[in-house]
């Protein structure tokens, strides 16, 4: 929780673990996905804010009507737990773990010492060939957040599950997906969400603070790579253009 609160603060609230009620209102991956009334959103947004969570050692205090939702980092936390468990399993020399398609952990080495490679989904053609591959080392974690994972269409508009904590609406900033590589599963998950909400330009300072590599895919089929990601990424689709982050 301390890591989550710190990330929320460092991202200026772009990542917010108290957004659960608003997420459930949209019901995007449920049986009744719909666009809520503005009045419904406003009623719930007044209780949203990571500042409403107070940590004192192992004691967690929430402001009245504020709820805590760790769903955005759940798979990353799972990767961290498994990584720690594997350290005591001497018979396991190396493995790669994929949780739900969006969170990946590499542990140890492959038998032939070649690098681990993780395929990256094309956010606008999820059923076809992969967009590319990213190399990660043992002890590294990869997470992708995209508007193609959970969404519904209404009046020609895509309503996806990555919500802006300030407005309660899906983030529409020209990005289709963000992929993060770093040395912590929770942070990889949280950073991919935070950077999607912030947008590429505003995410740079946050990425530098956490020493994380990133790939941004936009709606015009441009792929922007941070310096560290340039060495990791291999393009597999010539319908996309690779560019450096300015």
Which residues does each PLM region occupy?
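Mature catalytic core of soluble alpha/beta enzymes
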Residues: 1-246
